[in-house]
Swiss-Prot record:
GO biological process terms, semicolon-separated: trans-translation
Pfam families: SmpB (PF01668)
Function: Required for rescue of stalled ribosomes mediated by trans-translation. Binds to transfer-messenger RNA (tmRNA), required for stable association of tmRNA with ribosomes. tmRNA and SmpB together mimic tRNA shape, replacing the anticodon stem-loop with SmpB. tmRNA is encoded by the ssrA gene; the 2 termini fold to resemble tRNA(Ala) and it encodes a 'tag peptide', a short internal open reading frame. During trans-translation Ala-aminoacylated tmRNA acts like a tRNA, entering the A-site of stalled ribosomes, displacing the stalled mRNA.
SUPFAM superfamilies: Small protein B (SmpB)
NCBIfam families: PRK05422.1, smpB
Gene Ontology MF terms in the entry: RNA binding
Entry annotated with the keyword Disulfide bond: no
HAMAP family: SmpB
Gene: smpB
InterPro entries reported in the protein's UniProt record: SmpB, SsrA-bd_prot, SsrA-bd_prot_CS
Further facts: Although the Valle et al., electron microscopy paper indicates this protein came from T.thermophilus its sequence maps to A.aeolicus.
UniProt keyword list: Cytoplasm, RNA-binding
Protein name: SsrA-binding protein
Amino acid sequence: MGKSDKIIPIAENKEAKAKYDILETYEAGIVLKGSEVKSLREKGTVSFKDSFVRIENGEAWLYNLYIAPYKHATIENHDPLRKRKLLLHKREIMRLYGKVQEKGYTIIPLKLYWKNNKVKVLIALAKGKKLYDRRRELKEKAMKRELEREFKGKIHL
């Protein structure tokens, strides 16, 4: 990875890993207004709460991604929750559309980051976890943590 491929994270959807099984990920460009880019550069607030991707008329759109309004903008400020177009290859859009038609699949944003001075979104094809799956996962994590704690001081090399 060269110096020009530097990736600088902006925000991450931490809730997604807990609520969904991630099957495939895609990197997409995003169409933003000037005030949105300035807000992101100033470390403006970004929230993935209830955000999702929908495919309409062969185009991918990101809904409910909150980007805080730019403080120094005038009347030309953006709507913080507007839908934003995602830039993907046509075959990627068609593949995602085909998968989403199957029951239980959805497309969610995972991460927002800078790459080569452009804002990118990492989106994922995901399947929602059932409540009992999440509970089982939490129990397994707790047991693993307990075992590590128990053996921490006992193993000497």
